[in-house]
Regions:
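Extended two-metal-dependent nuclease catalytic cores across DNA- and RNA-processing enzymes
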Residues: 1-143
Length: 143
């Protein structure tokens, strides 16, 4: 499952502690809409708001089958209240800021993968796509 429809699913999955590849694969296999969402990764260098909204919806589905919301921050709040605050943070979906940076990085990687057969692809700087520089060294942007 290194790649589904040409996208790096493993890269996407690393943000979801406690959620396995099998669960994610089953959810994606059952829903043609989610398959199309992931096929949309890497089409453009910039992550569209529409694609990000769909990635949020997918993330909510991973954490709660009948979430009742498509926004990760709202789902985090609902799950926290449901467990009356007695919840470990790794049982909650990532917050919106964290998920956005992860989606930016996943889109950047996928865009490179989809251009891997081009002789001389033009690849823009990763800064602004979930990475930043710190002390002259490249780093993942942290929320």
């Amino acid at each position: 499952m290194q790649s589904i429809a040409g996208i790096p699913c493993i890269y996407w999955l690393c943000a979801f502690q406690g959620r396995g590849k099998v669960l994610v694969f089953r959810i994606m296999a059952k829903d043609q809409g989610f398959q199309e969402v992931f096929q949309g990764l890497g089409r453009k260098w910039q992550l569209s708001n529409e694609l990000y909204r769909d990635l949020q919806r997918f993330t909510c589905t991973i954490y709660c089958k009948n979430a009742g919301t498509n926004e990760v921050n709202e789902l985090r709040y609902r799950l926290f209240c449901l467990k009356k605050g007695d919840v470990d943070s790794n049982q909650l979906p990532p917050c919106n800021d964290s998920l956005r940076k992860h989606a930016l990085r996943a889109n950047y990687h996928t865009t490179i993968w989809k251009r891997s057969l081009q002789l001389c692809p033009v690849i823009p700087s990763p800064f602004g796509c979930g990475w930043c520089t710190e002390d002259g060294r490249d780093r993942k942007s942290v929320v």
